[in-house]
């Protein structure tokens, strides 16, 4: 396994920032690491990268124990922290040259040119980092993480500060890197995780609450289907709440409703019966699986 953590615990006095979590990430996997603010995501990432020592438990990167061999594990990792520390007085190419020296990168000019092209920094490469927008500063951090061609990428909020077009570009970079490397990344933009990852790990209050393929999580939640219905006429919300098998009703807009259920076929059948009995016109009726956002809310609002 490229990343493995076992019974990881990090305490600050009586507070358990990370509480006995275990998971593995294999080569070629892109795994989304999710949790609300303060859940322990960044703490876990800092332990895996060797920037923070755990209270108990163990972490390995490419089979190397992080606590016992922090320098060797850092050579295997490309790390983009949430707070991307950069030298603002250095030029982009100058900074990447410094990072190349730190990692003793062979053929540094070629590698620097390659990551600049890959991360879309070419037009900004002759500027000082302090002159760049937040989005381009984020790209510099990602370029630095990729420069020494690491086996493992750990990215904490990699699309923070990017505009929609830039997000799509960086998403493609991450997906491409994930074909050959191990990628663990956190994001508050759940749509990004859905677009990039097949598997997600969710932690809440320092504890692991989910670790599975996204498709399995969508199937496994007890109320994992949504029926979307739009009427031509106004319908009382209470009528829909009384439908057998409906666990929740949310009014989306005028005459449109979202119904939570684990039996969408039964609910749709009853909606058609109600429409027939009350002489109502249904404009649209469709089923969708539970989104990552709703799964996340259900698992972290406990």
Question: What are the residue ranges of the model-derived segments?
Answer:
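C-terminal coupling/interaction segments
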Residues: 262-302
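Non-catalytic surface loops within mature trypsin-like serine protease
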Residues: 27, 104, 123, 231-233, ...
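ABC transporter nucleotide-binding domains
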Residues: 2-5, 10-204, 208-210
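ABC transporter nucleotide-binding domain
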Residues: 169-262
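Short, Lys/Arg-enriched, disordered terminal segments
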Residues: 1-3, 301-302
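Residue-level "edge-of-site" marker
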Residues: 129, 254, 288
């Amino acid at each position: 396994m490229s990343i493995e953590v076992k019974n990881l615990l990090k305490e600050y006095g009586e507070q358990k920032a990370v509480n006995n979590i275990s998971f593995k990430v294999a080569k070629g996997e892109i795994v989304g690491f999710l949790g609300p603010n303060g859940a322990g995501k960044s703490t876990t990432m800092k332990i895996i990268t060797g920037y923070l020592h755990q209270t108990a438990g163990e972490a390995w990167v490419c089979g190397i124990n992080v606590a016992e061999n922090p320098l060797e594990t850092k050579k295997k990792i490309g790390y983009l922290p949430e707070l991307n520390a950069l030298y603002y007085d250095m030029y982009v190419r100058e900074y990447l040259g410094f990072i190349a020296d730190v990692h003793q990168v062979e053929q540094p000019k070629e590698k620097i040119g390659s990551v600049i092209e890959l991360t879309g920094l070419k037009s900004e490469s002759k500027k000082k980092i302090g002159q760049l927008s937040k989005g381009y500063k984020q790209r510099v951090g990602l370029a630095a993480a990729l420069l020494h061609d690491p086996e493992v990428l750990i990215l904490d909020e990699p699309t923070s500060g990017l505009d929609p077009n830039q997000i799509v570009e960086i998403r493609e970079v991450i997906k491409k890197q994930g074909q050959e490397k191990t990628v663990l990344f956190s994001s508050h933009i759940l749509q990004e995780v859905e677009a990039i990852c097949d598997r997600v790990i969710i932690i809440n209050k320092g504890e692991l609450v989910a670790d599975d393929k996204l498709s399995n999580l969508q199937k496994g939640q007890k109320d994992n289907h949504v029926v979307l219905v739009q009427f031509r006429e106004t319908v009382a919300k209470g009528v829909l709440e009384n439908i057998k098998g409906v666990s929740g009703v949310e009014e989306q807009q005028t005459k449109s409703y979202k119904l939570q259920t684990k039996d969408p076929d039964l609910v749709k059948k009853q909606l058609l019966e109600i429409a027939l009995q009350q002489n109502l016109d249904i404009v649209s009726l469709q089923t969708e699986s539970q989104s990552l956002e709703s799964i996340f809310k259900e698992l972290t609002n406990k």
